[in-house]
């Protein structure tokens, strides 16, 4: 937050769809709203509807912050965060990342079962008017080929804390998982993968 609390507490407002600002608070509010819709811990929902159907391991974890407990239906439930810092977030191995990437590659379908709707997937990978390299949440897009000039415009990636990345290359029917990759190394890695696939 800004040092000036008046600026932080009363930020300038922009009309929806006219501005972009990376901010975990909005993700955490979305997580809390989603928790209120499902009325049960979101890690349970993710496990039942996504992770178990894609055959994920039992080692992944999704934690909330220590101070993110809420009273729901007479029980204390942790509202999980979207980010992997300050003690919260998702912790996932490369194997499970690849499986999630494969689900994304196939537009939410896993072994013939549609786990995420194609309509949702289309929205998630549609560039926003204000930031053409960003879709929903952690769907980063190569629309203008600025981040990955060596890759086609339809390549996208999921980016996690520490530059843990799932690259999805639809034309090649291929997923690449990279762990702790420096940001400036992304294009070089994808370029080498594309060259190796030819």
Map each language-model feature to its residues.
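Active-site-proximal alpha-helical segments within enzyme catalytic domains
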Residues: 26-33, 86-110, 164-181
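Active-site Gly/Thr loop motif
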Residues: 68-84, 88, 126-175
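Extended ligand-binding clefts on enzyme/binding-domain cores
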Residues: 20, 120-130
């Amino acid at each position: 937050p800004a040092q000036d609390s008046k600026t932080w507490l009363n930020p300038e407002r922009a009309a929806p769809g006219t501005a972009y600002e990376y901010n975990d608070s909005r993700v955490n509010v979305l997580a809390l709203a989603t928790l209120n819709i499902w009325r049960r811990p979101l890690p349970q929902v993710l496990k039942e509807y996504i992770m178990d159907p894609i055959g994920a391991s039992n080692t992944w974890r999704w934690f909330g912050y220590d101070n993110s407990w809420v009273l729901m239906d007479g029980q204390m439930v942790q509202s999980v965060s979207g980010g992997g810092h300050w003690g919260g977030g998702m912790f996932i191995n490369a194997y499970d990342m690849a499986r999630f990437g494969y689900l994304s590659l196939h537009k939410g379908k896993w072994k013939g079962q549609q786990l995420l709707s194609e309509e949702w997937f289309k929205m998630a990978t549609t560039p926003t008017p204000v930031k053409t390299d960003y879709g929903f949440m952690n769907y980063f897009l190569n629309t203008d080929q600025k981040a990955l000039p060596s890759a086609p415009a339809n390549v996208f990636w999921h980016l996690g804390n520490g530059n843990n990345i799932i690259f999805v290359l639809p034309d090649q029917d291929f997923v690449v998982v990279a762990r702790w990759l420096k940001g400036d190394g992304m294009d070089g890695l994808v370029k080498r993968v594309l060259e190796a696939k030819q």
